[in-house]
């Protein structure tokens, strides 16, 4: 084999080693970025404020711990959106919800008259979608149930799900669906809630999580909607000692470490390349 081919082989070997180490260094839950999302359609109830203050205050709390925040509002809250939330670490569902039969369903902002375009989810013995109505306005919307989340949602990666709507944790079916898809904890209400009550309690929850660094069980303690008597609770029980702030720290540290690794690679490669070039010149001079 000629010396030129040997040198070329060495370069290829270096590239392979760098690529292999790069893959090894990627975080195991690399599909998740330190991002949060607020899915927001409480304003479907006309007397309910869109509560710009809630979104601004929640975003500020999350930004201060290094998280980017996306906000999907009213008409952006579709059936398909519920399928595509797996990339978020913190998922705040500021949406209407309620019981259909024995299960909690989450409202979309799509009028029930549009149900035809989701025919693939309809049929006998299919409980993927429901007809959910707001009693004060009489308007009805498409809602997604636990089986929809379980069968069609993206996988989550230890995500924290905060369901702000009514009866979101009256039974555990919806929570179980999110956990089955990879969420670490589901937080929701045991009864009906008011917009003001859920906004205030959720902001307090976020402060306890990301400013006071409390565990799930301590963060939800005594958080109630005084107007209805609803309590904020969590599922599963084994998540009681989870600290959501720690999840963010792990992702940020992993992302920073990986960035430093990538930055250093050109230096390592250039040094190796320089040494090989010297070897090539020495070999060349022998002829």
Region annotations inferred by a language model:
Residues 2, 75-81, 141-145:
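A diffuse structural propensity rather than consistent per-protein peaks
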């Amino acid at each position: 084999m000629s010396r030129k081919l040997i040198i070329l082989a060495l370069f290829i070997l270096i590239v392979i080693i760098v690529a292999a180490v790069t893959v090894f260094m990627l975080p195991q839950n690399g599909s998740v970025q330190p991002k949060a999302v607020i899915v927001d359609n409480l304003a479907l109830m006309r007397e309910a404020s869109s509560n710009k203050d809630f979104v601004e205050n929640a975003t500020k709390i999350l930004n201060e711990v290094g998280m980017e925040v996306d906000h999907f509002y009213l008409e952006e809250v579709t059936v398909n959106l519920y399928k595509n939330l797996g990339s978020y670490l913190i998922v705040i569902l500021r949406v209407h919800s309620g019981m259909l039969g024995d299960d909690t369903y989450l409202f979309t902002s799509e009028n029930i008259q549009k149900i035809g375009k989701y025919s693939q989810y309809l049929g006998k013995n299919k409980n993927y979608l429901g007809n959910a109505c707001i009693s004060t306005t009489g308007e009805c919307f498409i809602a997604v149930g636990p089986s929809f989340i379980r069968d069609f949602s993206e996988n989550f990666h230890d995500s924290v799900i905060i369901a702000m709507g009514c009866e979101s944790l009256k039974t555990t079916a919806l929570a179980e669906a999110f956990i089955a898809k990879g969420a670490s904890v589901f937080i929701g209400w045991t009864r009906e809630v008011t917009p003001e009550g859920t906004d205030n309690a959720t902001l307090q929850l976020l402060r306890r999580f990301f400013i006071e660094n409390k565990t799930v069980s301590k963060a939800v303690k005594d958080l109630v909607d005084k107007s209805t008597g609803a309590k904020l609770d969590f599922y599963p029980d084994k998540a009681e000692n989870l600290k959501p702030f720690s999840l963010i720290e792990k992702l940020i540290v992993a992302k920073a470490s990986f960035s430093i690794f990538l930055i250093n690679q050109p230096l390592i490669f250039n040094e190796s390349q320089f040494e090989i070039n010297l070897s090539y010149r020495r070999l060349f001079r022998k002829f």
